[in-house]
Amino acid sequence: MALHNPQYIFGDFSPDEFNQFFVTPRSSVELPPYSGTLCSIQAEDELPDGQEHQRIEFGVDEVIEPSEGLPPTPSYSISSTLNPQAPEFILGCTTSKKIPEAVEKDETYSSIDQYPASALALESNSNAEAETLENDSGAGGLGQRERKKKKKRPPGYYSYLKDGGEDSASPATLVNGHATSVGTSGEAVEDAEFMDVLPPVMPRTCDSPQNPVDFISGPVPDSPFPRTLGGDARTAGLCEGCHEADFEQPCLPADSLLRTAGTQPYVGTDTTENFAVANGKILESPGEDTAANGAELHTDEGADLDPAKPESQSPPAESALSASGAIPISQPAKSWASLFHDSKPSASSPMAYVETKCSPPVPSPLASEKQMEVKEGLVPVSEDPVAIKIAELLETVTLIHKPVSLQPRGLINKGNWCYINATLQALVACPPMYHLMKFIPLYSKVQRPCTSTPMIDSFVRLMNEFTNMPVPPKPRQALGDKIVRDIRPGAAFEPTYIYRLLTVIKSSLSEKGRQEDAEEYLGFILNGLHEEMLSLKKLLSPTHEKHSVSNGPRSDLIEDEELEDTGKGSEDEWEQVGPKNKTSITRQADFVQTPITGIFGGHIRSVVYQQSSKESATLQLFFTLQLDIQSDKIRTVQDALESLVARESVQGYTTKTKQEVEVSRRVTLEKLPPVLVLHLKRFVYEKTGGCQKLVKNIDYPVDLEISRELLSPGIKNKNFKCQRTYRLFAVVYHHGNSATGGHYTTDVFQIGLNGWLRIDDQTVKVINQYQVVKPPADRTAYLLYYRRVDLL
């Protein structure tokens, strides 16, 4: 008995073709109204007299088990069809008007194309078709009539037939552009035997591949099929009116056991490559695709296919799939096209039952990445096992001010990060800052997946990007008396981990529409590092006592025997005796020393003078000293410093009795930091709310001396000249005349070259000192970085 492989039908059917395939007495499919029950098939010998077509009937009470008495023919197979409107099947194809007689007489076809899911295909058993297949098997598997139309098919459409050999199925004629193939009865027996030795694996439906892929949302990578079309597709043999009602995919409940391609999330790019259905079980083999004979299935997405579950618990649905057992073997899959290629028959009974069960969807890479981000997010200091180690290191650290010769590297700017890059270059050129961050170990993501100190981690990583500069070449003589020094900068890089801090710590600098300001960003960095170090200190001493931080012994500032209880005092307030036995009430914030305050932290004293009342003084910590340069009298940095400490009157001050009194205020420097950062306030806010830039030239020296008149009375005579003298090592410039835009660059002193470098994002070049202190009109100094000369 000859076995024939299934014939597949794709594409739109003309009215004539529709009548030839589905309406003629020898070839028709009659589908009664859907009853939601399991299906069965009547054999040819059971057909009533005078009835020349097969009728698909739906059982009502029970599933009809396979019977040995039923003849094995006509045989049926389960296959999957793609949307007939898919471009790869209709491109360049013309609908065949005439169908071979063998097909018209003996074949029954059904095609479901709602989605790329399982299809219903009937195998032919006619002698005429067998003769056609036998004649064409040696000629590449194409019939004579269809071979003439081969040029009209899409490129590469028949490429899968080239690999046919002795073990492959014999090709057959084409029906509406698709081929059928024939195997041997021996192969079917081998497939049936192979089925029995397969281990049980989690079953699945013929509706979807083992790795469910969403064919609706987009094309599958590495698949030859583009996105399928499902909007206007109609199942062959069904009326238009019942199409949407019968085949619309409903939303499955959570406990539904049915898996369809339309409801599964995308979890990969592979689909099942080789599988077969035999005796109600799905088989997979590495080298061949086999199909069971004699089964035609209907799908019911809501049908309960678990035999252990009561029927009353089965959820309602629309399309039914009768199934009772499936054994797919896990095999890497490629695409849905593999379901149609080189199909081989296998011996089986007419009925095939496929059991489907839901399996938890494999998490997508994006979902797992988000979970990793959550796990690698910020954690409290108490939950960070590495935090205590860093805290112990910071407690014993000694600040090193020795200059280090680093190989310069530019910073790539792919956004509006020039204000950040300029600030980072100045901090890298600061020796104590560099040594501090190099003192802290650099932990990898594996060693420290969770962190409580993102700011410290980022700057430790930044400083480790820079290494000692190689021995510089000897200066060479150029034209005239100029000495030209060559510089060999390292490769530029993009510090994305630094940029990410703006969003990780949720700084206001990350808000859209804000003007990027280098001074504001510097404050963001220094305050952030200071706060993280404070939190680490609390690990070592949770009950840390509040200590007043002052420049010098406490006994020099406070006379205990002259303290008076004013009734308004607090732990942070005391009376201080100044020159000429004048007393003042001094208040200060809770200062806790950290390595950052040890580098950049200075103190200013603000004294308020009021008639017939004691002076009131306040100590404040600063990282950058704000210098007002708006006055026309201010032309140099020294002028701005003198203006800072000048005594000013406060207008409109009244007492509790609402009497206006004369009040004045004066600011002095209480403590000078090792690294003094001067901020030239070039951006002035107007009363109307606008902002303008002061483009006036301000002269600044390389060596800056802080005069005694700028210091507080208690420390004027306690600082030597070398402790009040600073040397310039970095300048941050702002380019342009606009306050709402512009560009930032940095000049830094390179100790290895004993000269200056100009760094503009990733561009590094050598300049002379004159270009630093006398910039052109289009670039104005904005931040001046000085170091104390006694620490050089």
UniProtKB/Swiss-Prot annotation:
It catalyses: Thiol-dependent hydrolysis of ester, thioester, amide, peptide and isopeptide bonds formed by the C-terminal Gly of ubiquitin (a 76-residue protein attached to proteins as an intracellular targeting signal). It comes from Mus musculus (Mouse). It holds the Pfam family PAM2. Specifically inhibited by spautin-1 (specific and potent autophagy inhibitor-1), a derivative of MBCQ that binds to USP10 and inhibits deubiquitinase activity. Regulated by PIK3C3/VPS34-containing complexes. Its EC number is 3.4.19.12. It is found in: Cytoplasm; Nucleus; Early endosome. Disruption phenotype: Mice with a deficiency in USP10 show more potent resistance to RNA virus infection. The active site is at 418 (nucleophile), 743 (proton acceptor). Residues 409-789 form the USP domain. GO terms for biological process: autophagy; cellular response to interleukin-1; DNA damage response; DNA damage response, signal transduction by p53 class mediator; DNA repair; monoubiquitinated protein deubiquitination; negative regulation of canonical NF-kappaB signal transduction; negative regulation of stress granule assembly. Residues 126-164, 300-323, 350-369, 542-580 are annotated as: Disordered. The lineage of its organism: Eukaryota, Metazoa, Chordata, Craniata, Vertebrata. This is Ubiquitin carboxyl-terminal hydrolase 10. Residues 2-99 are annotated as: Interaction with p53/TP53. The modification N-acetylalanine is found at residue 2.
